[in-house]
Amino acid sequence: MLFTLIKRFIEAVLLVLCLFMSGMLGAAAEAASLDYNDERNWAYWQEGKEKAVDCFLICPTVTLGGAGNYNLTLDNRQSGELRAFVGALNMERGIYDASCTMYAPLYRQVSLAVYRLPEKQREPYLKLAYSDVREAFQVYLKQSKKPFVLAGFSQGADMCIRLLKEFGAEPEVAKRLVACYAIGWRITEKELAAYPHLKMAQGAADIGVIVSFNSESPAVDASLMVPAGVKTKAINPLTWRTDNNYASALHNKGACFTDYSANIKKEQPYFCGAWLDAERGTLKINSKITPLAYPPVLDIFTAGVYHLYDYQFFYRNLQENVSLRTGAYWR
């Protein structure tokens, strides 16, 4: 009897110790961040050093997740997810690299599975992703003293906005910021009121501003990026105006569809017209472009949500605008 009690006591103590150690290890794993002073923890580090302006580019979502895997694991540098990470950056880098020295950190971004959770439940995983991005950004600010473009698409845009909320009012950041291209995520009037140092672009060449838009068909009235009842702030990349006037496809200097090696596989000038929706603030694409031809691909989007094509539809306009704003910075 006594032996049995002692045995159960020891088993209970061991169980508590195991749970304690498991929790400690889990917390340590979550808290551990990459050493961004090590160039191996960057997808791009000082690529194109001769440029007068930098670009700090943040990768969009590339991992599907599942089975409780809500943040990208960076342990295996040869994994398919890490190759997709660099590939996704390559798909959009051509917008920026003609004008900028390129920096892009690896980070524990959230997976697509996170966006299937209720919005409040996403935040712990997004905070972990952001903890890496902010650490990388602080290292970048110490390593380079050049002016910079901050850029990101989708989750990358969300991370850009978070960076500006936290650091954008700091004199050094405000002085060095050429513009922030936060494409494919919302930013609302409420956020601008809460962070008055955030300024939306009003034209083609203003400096220190946020460039943002979310593309969708005329029929869409809700999306993951801009839920129903929410109005986002934006600018039309065809005219660089913030009014609701329609801009014809004649303003479109070229849609470019790129691959993971940064090659342009297809280019089409005068691709589409667009206007900013008065109620949603989203960028409505004219009916020449159809959801059948440009499907949402991912099940977190509905037909007519052109999120995956945001920068591809307006590639040449964006590329030209980056050059324009970086030039305007020096004037």
What are these regions (language model features)?
Residues 1-8:
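N-terminal secretory signal peptides that target proteins for export/translocation
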Residues 12-23:
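Bacterial N-terminal signal peptides
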Residues 28-82:
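N-terminal low-complexity, Ser/Thr- and acidic-residue-enriched intrinsically disordered segments
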Residues 54-58, 103-106, 149, 179-182, ...:
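Structural recognition of the beta-strand scaffold that forms the well-ordered cores
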Residues 58-147, 290-331:
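Active-site catalytic motif of lipid deacylating hydrolases and related acyltransferases
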Residues 129-143, 166-315, 319-328:
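Surface cap/lid and interfacial helix-loop subdomains adjacent to catalytic sites
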Residues 152-156:
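Gly/Ala-rich beta-loop-alpha elbow adjacent to hydrolase catalytic centers
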Residues 159-163:
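Hydrolases whose catalytic domains are alpha/beta-hydrolase-1, hotdog thioesterase
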